């Protein structure tokens, strides 16, 4: 006799309803608020008879965390000032210098760059220093900021 189409195969419905209708994940673990649901799912502690194991594990974790905090407090001196970590190009520079292979080359390369970028000091002789001062004194007094120069006039040019 052929199977009727409107009946499921044996035990299918029992299999579907074995776990019951599940609540949404946010409401699934009411008694263990504050515990990461992912953690519960991974460790299979969501079942009621295993909650004791979870509580023990949580207690052990808390003890370990507090012990670690105490150890850190004992090691770290509160009055010591932390050195500031350089940011951006300074950090990059330090990283290059500390590099085992690139360190030697980069030092000379950076030194050369610094030499090229330095502003050159203006060297003036005594006679040269007096000449521009006289030129400024002999030039006519400048007009106030708001006043405009006549149309054909040009700005005064400084003497070399």
From Swiss-Prot:
The modification Phosphoserine is found at residues 31, 138. The modification N6-acetyllysine is found at residues 33, 145. Residues 127-142 are annotated as: 2 X 8 AA tandem repeats of A-X-A-K-A-P-A-[KQ]. GO terms for biological process: cell-substrate adhesion; cytoplasmic translation; fibroblast proliferation; multicellular organism growth; translation; translation at postsynapse; translation at presynapse. Residues 1-26 have a biased composition (Basic residues). It is found in: Cytoplasm. Sequence repeats lie at residues 127-134, 135-142. Residues 1-34, 115-160 are annotated as: Disordered. InterPro entries: Ribosomal_eL29. The keyword Aminoacyl-tRNA synthetase does not apply. Coiled coil: none annotated. GO terms for molecular function: heparin binding; structural constituent of ribosome. It holds the Pfam family Ribosomal_L29e. Residues 126-160 have a biased composition (Low complexity). Disulfide bonds: none annotated. The modification N6-methyllysine is found at residue 5. One of its GO terms (cellular component) is presynapse. Keywords: Acetylation, Cytoplasm, Methylation, Phosphoprotein, Repeat, Ribonucleoprotein, Ribosomal protein. Belongs to the eukaryotic ribosomal protein eL29 family. Component of the large ribosomal subunit. Component of the large ribosomal subunit. The ribosome is a large ribonucleoprotein complex responsible for the synthesis of proteins in the cell. This is Large ribosomal subunit protein eL29. It comes from Mus musculus (Mouse). The gene is Rpl29.
């Amino acid at each position: 006799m052929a199977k009727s189409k409107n009946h499921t195969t044996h035990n299918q419905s029992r299999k579907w309803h074995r776990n019951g209708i599940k609540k949404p994940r946010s409401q699934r673990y009411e008694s263990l608020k504050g515990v990461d649901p992912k953690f519960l799912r991974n460790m299979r502690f969501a079942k009621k008879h295993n909650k004791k194991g979870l509580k023990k594990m949580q207690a052990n974790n808390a003890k370990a965390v507090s012990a670690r905090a105490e150890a850190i407090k004992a090691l770290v001196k509160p009055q010591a000032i932390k050195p500031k970590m350089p940011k951006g190009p300074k950090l990059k520079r330090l990283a290059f210098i500390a590099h085992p292979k690139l360190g030697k080359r980069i030092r000379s390369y950076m030194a050369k760059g610094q030499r090229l970028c330095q502003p050159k000091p203006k060297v003036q002789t005594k006679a040269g220093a007096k000449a521009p001062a006289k030129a400024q004194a002999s030039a006519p007094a400048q007009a106030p900021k708001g006043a405009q120069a006549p149309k054909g006039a040009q700005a005064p040019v400084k003497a070399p």
